[in-house]
Amino acid sequence: MNKILNIIMALFIAICFFGCEKDDICSGGTPTTPRLMIEFREKDNPSILKPVTNLTAVATGMTTGVVFNEGLSSTDPNRYLTSANKIGLPLKITGETTEYTLTQNSTSTNPAIRNEDKIVFNYTTKEIYVSRACGYKTNFDLTGSPVQEPNTVDSNRWISNIVVETPNIVTENEIHIKIYF
């Protein structure tokens, strides 16, 4: 009787051991849905990178802007500001269009200095299976050049030209669009 009990216990342990799977954990280094990478350049000398002063980027339908300073509190307005020469903007994965309002000098109370331009990005999406733990990511293909909407506040646009460098958005390691101002 003792032998039968030992055999049953050994079989039970073996079944439990071999029935286990390794943990599915999505590594932090796993590529995810890439953002649209934009670089700002001097319009009169295109070889020079140019930082945008106090830029905010707000997608249509959003109540707050894109977070550029994740270390700041969600109540701190500087969380949504950048003065960099490169930014990354997320695109909607549920549609084929995303519209952003890019506001230069957004903290200024002087309307002559504060300037906003609306840009519409048109694209197609492609879902890519990454792994069971990570699920899917979405890649984008820009269709045509981004469109600047007419400025309803005034006729002054701060963006002079928009050039698509890489229409296939599969990684954040390359510049997809250059904006000249």
Predicted ranges, named:
Residues 1-31:
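Bacterial Sec-dependent N-terminal signal peptides
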Residues 21-30, 39, 77-181:
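Extracytoplasmic cysteine-anchoring/structural motifs
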Residues 34-36:
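Structural beta-strand segments of beta-rich domains
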Residues 39-49:
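Structural motif
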Residues 46-48, 67, 112, 131:
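Short acidic, gly/pro-rich beta-turn/loop elements at beta-sheet edges
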Residues 49-66:
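Extended low-complexity, serine/threonine- and proline-enriched intrinsically disordered segments
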Residues 65-80:
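Solvent-exposed serine/threonine-rich low-complexity stretches and specific carbohydrate-binding patches
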